[in-house]
Amino acid sequence: MPAKNKNKTRRSPKPQASRMRAPGYGFPEGTKGLLPWSWADQRLKKSHNYWITTIKAEASLTSPHAMVVWGLWQDGRFLFSTGSKSRKARNLAQNPNCVVCTEHAQEAVIVEGVAEIADVAARRKFLPVYEKKYKFDMGKMKDDILSMKEPVFAVRPLLAFALWEKHFQSKSTRWKFESPLSPS
């Protein structure tokens, strides 16, 4: 499994916005028209289903594996639970790099990040919000999640992209997140 996130780290409150780099797509120069981070943050919070892409853990297979998951955008990270024997969990144990996407492609938010095992405090915060959002009783799974028997992953963003179909050329935005700083 990826390393447990034992240290509290401080992060920049907002990532740095810039124009996407995609030659041939007609994106304008400069920063006029870039979307604010709040646009992406809102869509990450409101999405019901998310796509997560991991890299297959088997040595002979290096192709991506995409799957729909339920989760939360909470405290600047994407949190989701999965069985410890699921392909996602096995893949993330070997390679914590992943991509998370919101469900609506016409207002897409794509997050490239690193998955870490969420600590107990994050899990305690995650569970009631998750159950309310999905109207889903985690039942006995709560004990396994809180006792760390089953994983809850927290994807720490490194880069994020917004692609708004209606304003594709003028508003497509890229955000770069600061690396975590030393513990506070």
Regions found by a protein language model. Give the residues of each.
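Short, basic/aromatic recognition patches
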Residues: 26-51
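Generic structural signal for secondary-structure transition and capping sites
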Residues: 48-49, 97, 135, 160
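Short amphipathic alpha-helical segments and helix-helix/interface helices
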Residues: 40-41, 89, 127, 142
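Charged, gly/pro-rich active-site loop segments
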Residues: 2-34, 107-184
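A generic structural signal for alpha-helix starts
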Residues: 86-87, 121
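A generic local structural motif
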Residues: 36-39, 65-67, 85, 140-141
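Alpha-helix boundary recognition
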Residues: 44-45, 93-94, 131
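Short beta-strand segments
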Residues: 47-84, 90-92, 98-102, 110-114
